[in-house]
Amino acid sequence: MVNSNIEIKALGEANLLDNNDKLITPAKLREVFGSMLNHLGGNLYFTNAGGGLTVPAATETKLIGDFNTTGYKVTEYRPWYVDADYIVGANSTVQLRDFKMASFVSFRFEVGLTVPSNTEVQILARVKNSLGQKVFDINVEDLVFKSAATRTKTSNFFFFMDSDIENGTLEIYVQSDNEIQATWQSFLIDAR
């Protein structure tokens, strides 16, 4: 894993025995995944939010955070758009400018959740056009908590850039059947 700043630990080593022909081993898996991670690029942002946002029951609520607008370089391989500014002001809206048409846009984010027992939480991504009109929603997560919990949920989704959403925006929303606390902690955005 030359030049990787992400350490791969174990990766199933306890549960994966060498197969008969010795072509797939835990060490080989670590090497392959390490190589994949080395070639992932993107801009990683962390929020400076001090506490959770209260999400009222049965109310779709936009997640907000005081984001540091300087992207952190995830690996040594930086994508072509690395100097673009994807967060504007304090409105926590990801700007979809500077993306080439038909590019594959991947998005990874973390949301801290504090929920009571017997709670369903939905997380969705809303993509709007340059006029601020909704073009589509992506139902990213539908979680059911049988018992009260405080945890960080990491989610991934992707879409393809199209002229309908050129210079548009992306926002993250949370909805729950009970009042919860939600904190948008970080996001990673990349395009190929």
Summary of predicted features, one role per range:
Residues 1-40:
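Extracellular "spike/adhesin" assembly and maturation modules
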Residues 24-30, 38-192:
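Extracellular jelly-roll beta-sandwich "head" domains, especially the C-terminal globular C1q domain
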